[in-house]
From Swiss-Prot:
Catalyzes a salvage reaction resulting in the formation of AMP, that is energically less costly than de novo synthesis. This is Adenine phosphoribosyltransferase. One of its GO terms (molecular function) is adenine binding. The keyword Aminoacyl-tRNA synthetase does not apply. It is an enzyme of class 2 (transferase).
């Protein structure tokens, strides 16, 4: 299945000059959604994954079903102030300013084999923040998996030492 055909592209959203990749169309079509998760599972089945980490919000959409299919736990990474227990945090840079992500301090145990799952790799800034938190807790990142990669933004280069996978690539 060509997943690129299943992704709706919206020009000028959320602002002029942006070509937004809308993954809700994959979620709506049961065959495409199943194919996406099954493809990721096939890539990861021999990695002995303990935990899948998904960044807010679209990382939840692919990370949770992936964790279930792998028989692994799922850890959500949220924006600051959204998690109820003791957290660790990491700041990351945006085009104009910065933001902060958090995860529960007890969500990753030392030595656990971790996969990060998200919808899109652009510059890699968000994922670097997630990596920082996982590694500070002693987790071993065995793979980072994306549905979409915007290759021109060179996020993969920022994540160079990790095993990176993307199912669909766009040159922007």
């Amino acid at each position: 299945m060509d997943l690129k055909d299943k992704i709706r592209v919206i020009q000028g959203f959320p602002k002029e000059g942006i070509s937004f990749k809308d993954v809700t169309t994959i979620l709506q079509e049961k065959e495409a959604f199943k194919y996406t998760i099954d493809t990721l599972v096939e890539e990861l089945k021999d990695k002995n994954v303990d935990v899948v980490v998904g960044p807010e919000a679209r990382g939840f959409l692919f990370g949770a079903p992936l964790a279930y299919a792998l028989g692994a736990g799922f850890v959500p990474v949220r924006k600051k102030g959204k998690l109820p227990s003791t957290t660790i945090s990491s700041k990351y840079e945006l085009e104009y300013g910065s933001d902060e992500l958090e995860m529960h301090k007890d969500s990753i145990k030392p030595g656990q084999r971790v996969v990060i799952a998200d919808d899109l790799l652009a510059t890699g800034g968000t994922i670097c923040s997630v990596i920082e938190m996982i590694e500070s807790l002693g987790g071993e990142i065995v793979s980072i998996n994306f549905l979409i990669e915007l290759t021109d933004l060179k996020g993969r280069e920022k994540l160079g030492k990790y095993d990176i996978s993307s199912l669909v690539q766009y040159d922007i």
